[in-house]
């Protein structure tokens, strides 16, 4: 799909969605964003088309009987709890997929997550179930599974600035990731329409540079603040308890 395409975007008001819309526009695609009623559209690029409605009405209010070449979804559940995850990460996408097929869409680009490789939580299982549905649909697909976002690594900045220790599980070196920026990920998602190598593939992706651990993050943050590193080690067993609690929540 090297030529300009007409693209419907879901989840356009999130940080990754906004970056993806900008990247699609920069590549010359005609972008239509389907937003929830009342969703804040400020900051989206000029020249796009905004349409609003519930996901159940996407065929009528989103596609409107017109032909689209592609559907790009950055839509995700907010809480990740079982009911929310099933409704958004799976069911809403199933509705959107059916409407896309009826609208003649040739290609769906789906923002998923690297953590579905080892599903332990409801939202991971819901995402994985829809991935399987998309793969079996016969539609050309690109399923993008990014590692951590830079923004997700910034959650402890405020507490460290307030003089509190950086929290790590175990010794802070149990996990490592290659975080990716919103702009890089948005550009990668948009590029899936043009790059045949990314078609009909599940695409794990991380940012540039080496993988970093939570301890690496802490050391970098304290260095930037000109302070000695101060960690608080949380027992790994607490992680299991948190996962169990999240899995049970909403049932």
Task: Provide a role label for each language-model segment.
Residues 6, 13-15, 188-251:
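Mid/C-terminal beta-alpha module of Rossmann-like enzyme folds, strongest
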Residues 39-103, 115-117:
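NAD(P)H-binding glycine-rich loop region in Rossmannoid oxidoreductase-like domains
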Residues 159-180, 188-192, 196-200, 204:
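A conserved pocket-lining segment of Rossmann-fold NAD(P)-dependent short-chain dehydrogenase/reductase
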Residues 112, 118, 129-158:
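Conserved beta-loop-beta element that borders a ligand/cofactor-binding pocket
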Residues 10, 34, 74-75, 108-113, ...:
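SDR active-site strand-loop-helix element
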Residues 4-29:
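N-terminal Rossmann NAD(P)H-binding glycine-rich loop of SDR-like oxidoreductase domains
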Residues 30-36:
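Conserved glycine-rich Rossmann-like NAD(P)H-binding loop of the short-chain dehydrogenase/reductase
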Residues 86-90, 120-128, 135, 175-183, ...:
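Short-chain dehydrogenase/reductase
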């Amino acid at each position: 799909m090297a030529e300009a395409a007409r693209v419907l975007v879901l989840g356009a008001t999130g940080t990754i969605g906004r970056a993806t819309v900008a990247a699609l526009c920069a590549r010359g695609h005609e972008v239509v964003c389907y937003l929830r009623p009342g969703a804040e559209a400020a900051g989206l690029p000029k020249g796009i088309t905004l349409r609003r409605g519930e996901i159940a009405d996407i065929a009528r209010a989103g596609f409107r009987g017109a032909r689209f070449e592609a559907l790009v979804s950055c839509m995700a559940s907010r809480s990740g709890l079982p009911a929310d995850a099933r409704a958004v990460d799976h069911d809403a996408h199933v509705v959107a997929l059916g409407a896309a097929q009826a609208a003649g869409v040739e290609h769906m680009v789906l923002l998923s997550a690297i953590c579905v490789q080892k599903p332990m939580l409801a939202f991971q299982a819901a995402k994985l179930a829809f991935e399987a549905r998309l793969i079996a649909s016969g539609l050309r697909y690109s399923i993008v599974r990014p590692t951590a976002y830079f923004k997700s690594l910034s959650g402890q900045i405020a507490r460290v600035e307030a003089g509190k220790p950086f929290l790590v599980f175990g010794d802070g070196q149990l996990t490592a990731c290659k975080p990716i920026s919103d702009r890089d990920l948005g550009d990668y998602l948009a590029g899936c329409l043009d790059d045949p190598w990314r078609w009909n593939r599940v695409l794990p992706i991380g940012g540039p540079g080496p993988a970093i651990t939570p301890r690496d993050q802490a050391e970098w943050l304290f260095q930037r603040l000109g302070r000695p590193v101060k960690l608080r080690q949380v027992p790994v067993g607490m992680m299991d308890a948190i996962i169990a609690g999240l899995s049970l929540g909403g049932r």
